[in-house]
Amino acid sequence: MTSKGSQEEYDYLYKIVLIGDSGVGKSNLLSRFTRNEFSLETKSTIGVEFATRTIQTEGKTIKAQVWDTAGQERYRAITSAYYRGAVGALLVYDIAKQATYKSVERWILELRENADRNIEIMLVGNKSDLRHLREVSTDEAKEFSEKHKLTFIETSALDSSNVELAFQNILTQIYHIMSRPSHSTGPQTTIDSNTETIILPTTSEPPAAKSGCC
């Protein structure tokens, strides 16, 4: 299928949101995944921005629309529009800052209040390159993820570790869910943004066999 106003072809369009406290590296995760760029001078995001990237999974072309917003409290008024239409969320904390990890439960509550109840959530421990400054153990975060039924991964936007894998995994998980019969026979899903309304194509093909991912 071809997106309107673009020659780029894709089978599915999924909106993914990045959430978490300010300074955990959300903007650099976005730029590393979509443009393979990293900036040490990144300032706190003001308002909202999004970027897109197309990937292949199980023979399908998936276009990810990844949204980024500041985690600071004064910007929380935008949350309802920010979450609207999102089918996945990367909840990011800084492994070298315990306070950002302690905020994770609050972000989960905000997700539950504003996002679709079936949104796929991945907990992301970012800045894994700062292992010498680690304040949050991998085992603790894994245990938390299992308790809250989240997937979990540690990444580094600085050295690219697991950034590609994190997005690939959550997009594949969403594809498995969205290609089930209960999703493929219903009305088309739309993604609302401030700039355009995007139709999420449905599929008449049978769901792909589920494959494992971390």
From Swiss-Prot:
Name of protein: Ras-related protein Rab-11A
The encoding gene: rab11A
SMART domains: RAB, RAN, RAS, RHO
Gene Ontology molecular functions: GTP binding; GTPase activating protein binding; GTPase activity; nucleotide binding
Keyword Transferase part of the UniProt annotation: no
Covalently lipidated residues, kind S-geranylgeranyl cysteine: 213-214
Keywords per UniProt: GTP-binding, Lipoprotein, Membrane, Nucleotide-binding, Prenylation, Protein transport, Transport, Vacuole
Domain of life: Eukaryota
